Design a protein with these regions (language model features):
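Extended hydrophobic leader/signal-anchor segments used for secretion and membrane insertion
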Residues: 1-482
Length: 482
């Protein structure tokens, strides 16, 4: 009698567990709008109620089988849980470079929310958890490209807002050399740079400033082809030329300084949107030419937030990235600083678009209209280089220009184009030391990964061990970093 009561009580508990799990699972399916997941419901029912499938058969075994399978079971469960959580809710991201300093620092570990902008349904769902694109040590792909699902984003808490710090997939990372030392390089920039050198050596280099738009297009096609063919002919040096799907490209983090439909222009380092100046981040950095009377004191560097990387740049080139606060402090230090001034010769070459001459610099750029979903733009040979990548690569159209300069999209003469996606303009706060939209263009909406919420760990690469922990940054909310 007692055993029967216990059995009945146990079944009630199992039914309660099943009801809770089923309700949560159905809510999840409603959220992601995927009723295909209903095929899992019978298995959930079996786990809690019918128990027809002996899910944990290994518990009946003796010896090493039971021990090994218990660890395998725990490991598989952990990997599946991590995969699911990283895909739909949040993931960890570490700041690898100084492009957002001094807002986010090298060595900051971020809690990145997928729910803020809505998680993407994965394009390549079959991937090894905790990897982005490559298995460590063996240097092979950590994912398979079948099945490949089209872009779709689940409803989130909101949209990307102006001046948000955003994690996204690197737009120019669709094609790369798989030799490890070149994987982080911009493949398109490599092709144009190498091609330019080849044409110069062959006496075929031209002054692009005097060419009309159609002549420029043909010339840059020749430059790109020369560079790509050279890279393809040197697999021992560069490896194979490979492609990566959107969700397997490197993760970048920058600040969104331009939204879909806005016209962006940079004038004397200030970003203007639709003619109005956008507020600079509090800790924005520019590089300064500086001449010292002696050695730079380490204590002063720590006080002003100047890193070893910053000092190395100064020792190599005579320029140093500084916030306004650091600049004013050094300018006032007459005993140390002989002269200091803004670097007006900051990096200017190799700007987007790579296949046209614009005369723009990283401090004076544009204007460019940022594409907005459903909006159209009149196409001509002058603005085509700016929007060609959006039309061809990100939105999957066939685009050609004939010998007369006529533009054809999917075989039809095109005078205009209507965009299918929203696009964003991303820049680092370290304005003279950031590879961003000025160099590789727009960020499509399907590349948006998530929003950093807070810094859960921070360790300075300049100070090893316990002394490098930045206690004052732990659990700081990223939205408070303006």
């Amino acid at each position: 009698m007692i055993d029967k009561q216990k059995q009945n009580l146990n079944m009630k508990v199992q039914w309660a567990k099943f009801a809770v799990v089923l309700a949560l699972y159905l809510l999840f399916l409603i959220w992601v709008e995927s009723w295909l997941g209903l095929i899992v419901v019978p298995f959930i029912f079996d786990v809690y109620i019918t128990k027809k499938i002996h899910w944990q058969w290994w518990k009946d075994e003796e010896g090493p089988v039971r021990f090994i399978m218990s660890w395998v079971d725990a490991l598989v469960f952990a990997l599946v849980a991590v995969y699911f959580i990283n895909l739909f809710f949040f993931q960890n991201y570490v700041i690898p470079s100084s492009s957002l300093e001094k807002s986010l620092l090298t060595g900051d570990y971020l809690f990145v929310s997928k729910v803020s902008y809505g998680p993407r349904i994965p394009e390549t769902p079959l991937t090894m958890p905790l990897t982005q694109h490559t298995l460590p040590l063996v240097n092979v792909k950590s994912y398979v490209e079948w099945p490949h699902w089209d872009y779709r984003r689940v409803k989130g808490l909101g949209n990307v807002k102006l001046n948000d710090i955003v994690v996204f997939n690197y737009p120019a990372g669709d094609t790369l050399c798989n030799e490890e030392r070149y994987q982080a390089n911009d493949f398109y920039l490599m092709c144009y740079s190498i091609g330019d050198q080849i044409l110069e050596q062959n006496g075929q280099q031209q002054d692009i400033r005097v060419l009309n738009p159609l002549q420029q297009r043909r010339y840059f096609e020749k430059v790109y082809a020369a560079g790509r063919n050279y890279i393809a002919s040197m697999p021992g040096e560069y490896g194979d030329i490979i492609s990566r799907p959107t969700d397997r490209r490197e993760n970048y983090v920058k600040r969104c300084v331009g939204l879909p439909g806005q016209t962006l222009q940079i004038k004397n380092r200030i970003v203007y949107l639709d003619g109005k100046a956008n507020k600079e981040p509090d800790n924005v950095q520019y590089t300064y030419k500086m001449k010292l009377k002696g050695e730079f004191p380490i204590e002063l560097a720590d006080e002003l937030g100047i890193t070893n990387e910053d000092l190395l740049m100064y020792n190599q080139s005579g320029v140093i990235p500084l916030t306004k606060k650091a600049y004013l402090a050094l300018k006032a230090n007459k005993n140390l600083v002989e002269s200091i001034s803004i670097n007006t010769d900051a990096r200017y070459g190799d700007l987007y678009p790579l296949n046209a001459y614009t005369g723009w610099t990283c401090d004076n750029y544009g204007p460019v209209w940022i594409p907005k979903k459903g909006k159209s733009i009149q196409l001509n040979l002058k603005n085509l280089p700016i929007y060609e990548r959006c039309i061809k690569v990100y939105e999957g159209n066939d685009l050609k220009v004939d010998s007369q300069g006529n533009i054809f999209i999917n075989g039809k003469l095109a005078k205009s184009y209507t965009f299918k996606l929203d696009y964003y303009w991303m820049m680092g706060d370290n304005r003279h030391n950031s590879a961003d939209s000025r160099y590789w263009g727009f960020v499509p909406e399907d590349h948006i990964v998530g929003k950093p919420i807070f810094i859960w760990w921070s360790h300075s690469p300049d100070h090893p061990g316990f002394s490098g922990i930045r206690w004052n940054r732990l659990f700081n909310f990223v939205d408070n970093i303006k």
